[in-house]
Amino acid sequence: MRPGTNTAVRRVNSASARKCAVVCVAAIGIAWWAAVSPARGAEITGKDPAGAPGEAAPDFALTNLAGTTVRLSDFKGKIVLLDFWATWCAPCREEIPDFIQLQKQYSGRGFTVLGIALDEDGAAVVKPLAQKLGVNYPLVIGDTQVAARYGGIQAVPTAFLIGRDGRILKAFVGARSKSEWEQTIRRALPPAAPGQN
């Protein structure tokens, strides 16, 4: 063996080991991100919700926390953020303060949040949380039929932005930041009159 050959081999092996280490660290990082990322949106299957943009949003008749029947068609002419959620879902609860603010900001421009709670215990668990957080938008108690009509809701939160004509503009799986929701809502609303947000 020529002098210096072992040194060259060691250098090659060392460089290969470094490349391997970088690849391994990157793979571990990607795997970790994939494992923790769904928790933000509480995704169960990663399946997109039903309801392609342009399709009519399925109507429903559900009971609100006061026992009154509420229909999606009651809101025709408004931009509706239809939010499927549950009290046991941490990302859902985290979004509620943002929805309260969005309702305050944009309800005067023909926008509303409409929450559909998918809790098995219904109003008994939803009402105390709504009161505690000061929810200012309509909440109704969902059921398996309405979930099925919207594609079998595979994860919460799942939301649908519905246009003034009652057609789906966009579907979302997982939680979003207030700024993301605000951008989406502003794009859907008509231009603001002077002095409006």
Language-model features: locations:
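N-proximal helix/coil linker or "cap" segments that precede and/or mark the start of modular domains
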Residues: A31-D59, P191-N197
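Structural microenvironment flanking redox-active thiols in thiol-disulfide oxidoreductases
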Residues: R93-L133, G142-R149
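Short pre-active-site segment immediately N-terminal to redox-active cysteine/selenocysteine motifs
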Residues: K78-V80, F84-W88, A155
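A short beta-strand-turn-helix
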Residues: P49-G54, D59-V80, Q103-Y106, Y150
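Bacterial N-terminal signal peptides
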Residues: V23-W32
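N-terminal secretory signal peptides that target proteins for export/translocation
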Residues: M1-A17
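Thiol/disulfide oxidoreductase modules built on the thioredoxin-like
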Residues: P128-N136, I141-R186
